Structure formats: structure tokens, C-alpha cells
Design a protein with these regions (language model features):
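Glycan-recognition and catalytic cores of secretory/periplasmic carbohydrate-active enzymes
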Residues: 28-186
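Bacterial Sec-dependent N-terminal signal peptides
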Residues: 1-31
């Protein structure tokens, strides 16, 4: 049997379990800025060393990249940014890839390429917009439009279509609401 999203969840659960065991030992200690940066770099470097970026843009991978972008904003480490760019390029700056809006779905739960309107496939747009904004700040907005083309297409469709229950589960508030707020600046 191949790799499943549940394998990733097991890894994440194990990391949290180990971290929670270490928490009481470190709770009494005051951490300074350098120690926090060192820990962030250590954890993020471990992740990037042990997980290839060429994976799908579904939530189980995309959530990491939203965090990696925040680390990049803080540290400006090009290696971290390059890792996420490789992931975005691997996914052609897209979430679910069905081209025909008449076939787009959001219910019931689904991981298929036709679940374009399902937030688990839209969280990737947060990162694509961040990457686009980095290029736009360099004066490359027009040349970088491909980075947000799919996000604009999908979210415009969602914003102006009739259903009002696209965010029918709580995770969508983390996955999709930031996409909508980031799109405001595009």
C-alpha cells in the first residue's frame, strides 16, 4: 500500500507527542530570540531534508507551506523559499485541476481533481499568493501572474456563484478565509 494522508498525520501526531514530553522540561527555561530562531531552523530543516517538495497541493502538504512562508518572512532564508517554490511549480500553481467549472465539486468530502471548490484543495492558494506578492514587490507582477491565475479563477467563481455553504466544516476557516483576505490585495 502506498503513502496516504494518514501517514502524514501519524508523523505530525508523533512530533507533537515528542514535543509535549519536552515541554515541561523547557517550560521553566526562558527562551531568547536566538534560541527560538535556532529551534525553528532545526525543525524546518529536518522537515525539508526528510520530505520532498514534489507532493500534491492538498491540505496535508499545503498547510506546511503556509507555515514555511511565515518562517521565510521572519528569517529570509532563500533555501526555505526555494523549497516552497519547487512545491508550487510541481503543482503548476494549482489546487484541484479539473478545468470545466460544470464538473467542480465541494461536497461531499473528496480528494479528487474535480473537488476544485473544496477548501482542502484551496489552502495552497495562500502560499501561491504569498509567492506572487514577493515577485510583485520586485516589480515582476505582470510576469508572475501565472502564480495566481488559478486562485483568481476558482475564488472568483466561488465568490459569485449561488451556493453559500462552501465552508461547511470548521477547517475551511483556516484553509480558505485567508485566501479570500489575501486576494483582496491582488
Amino acid at each position: 500500500m502506498g503513502h496516504t494522508p494518514y501517514d502524514d498525520m501519524k508523523k505530525i501526531f508523533l512530533m507533537f507527542a515528542v514535543a509535549s514530553l519536552a515541554l515541561p522540561m523547557s517550560a521553566a527555561r526562558k527562551w531568547n530570540h536566538e534560541q527560538i530562531v535556532e529551534m525553528i531552523q532545526k525543525v524546518n530543516n529536518y522537515w525539508q531534508t526528510n520530505n520532498k517538495p514534489e507532493v500534491r497541493s492538498f491540505w496535508d502538504n499545503a498547510a506546511y507551506h503556509t507555515g514555511n512562508m511565515e518562517v521565510w518572512k521572519m528569517l529570509k532564508d532563500q533555501k526555505m523559499l526555494d523549497y516552497t517554490i519547487r512545491w508550487a511549480e510541481h503543482n503548476d500553481w494549482s489546487g484541484a485541476t479539473e478545468a470545466n467549472p460544470a464538473k467542480w465539486k465541494y461536497k461531499p468530502y473528496g480528494e479528487g481533481k474535480d473537488h476544485v471548490l473544496f477548501g482542502d484543495w484551496q489552502i495552497c492558494f495562500q502560499t501561491y499568493i504569498d509567492l506572487y506578492n514577493i515577485e510583485a514587490a520586485k516589480g515582476n507582477a505582470a510576469a508572475s501572474e501565472y502564480m495566481v491565475k488559478r486562485a483568481k479563477e476558482v475564488m472568483h467563481y466561488e465568490a459569485y456563484s449561488e451556493p453559500t455553504d462552501y465552508w461547511w466544516w470548521s477547517d475551511a476557516l483556516y484553509m480558505v478565509m485567508p485566501v479570500m483576505t489575501k486576494m483582496y490585495k491582488l
